[in-house]
Design a protein with these regions (language model features):
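Active-site neighborhood of glycoside hydrolase catalytic domains
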Residues: 1-88, 93-109
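Aromatic-lined glycan-binding groove of carbohydrate-active enzymes
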Residues: 98-135
Length: 135
């Protein structure tokens, strides 16, 4: 992460104000099968969910430390809303209007990319399907 945001080989590669950290579709099952990862989690008394939260918060801290605004997928909010900084921008893609309302009411800013209407690999849809999205 340090290389991507500044001070490393990739410095300047992502020069914008915002940095999307991802955080969706994380499969933590493999963490339970790797001995050194299991030992690391046990030493910190973390479950796989806790380790995921630890990692997410470390990444968000690094992004903020470089003066950037962090964007994270909706799953980060879903699993870690109590621990992530309120200045994290949540990128909503799975949810509906109710999810949007909850995220905003919890004090987060939101980018809406509802997959039902904005998942562009659905090339069989016509332009009016996308244009008529009224989340």
């Amino acid at each position: 992460m340090q290389d991507m945001l500044g001070g490393g080989r990739a410095e300047g590669l992502f020069p914008g104000q915002y940095f999307h950290v991802g955080g969706d579709e994380v499969n933590t099952k493999c963490w339970e099968e790797v001995e050194h990862v299991k030992a690391w989690m046990a030493a910190r008394n973390l479950t796989t969910t806790g380790a995921y939260g630890y990692f997410v918060n470390r990444v968000l801290e690094q992004v903020r430390g470089h003066g950037r605004e962090a964007i994270a997928w909706e799953e980060v909010y879903k699993h870690h809303k109590a621990s992530i900084p309120k200045d994290t921008i949540i990128h909503l893609w799975l949810g509906d209007g109710e999810n949007l309302k909850n995220i905003v009411n919890d004090g987060f800013r939101v980018i809406v990319s509802n997959y039902k209407h904005w998942y562009l690999p659905q090339l069989w849809e016509t332009w009016d399907y996308y244009y008529g999205n009224d989340l």
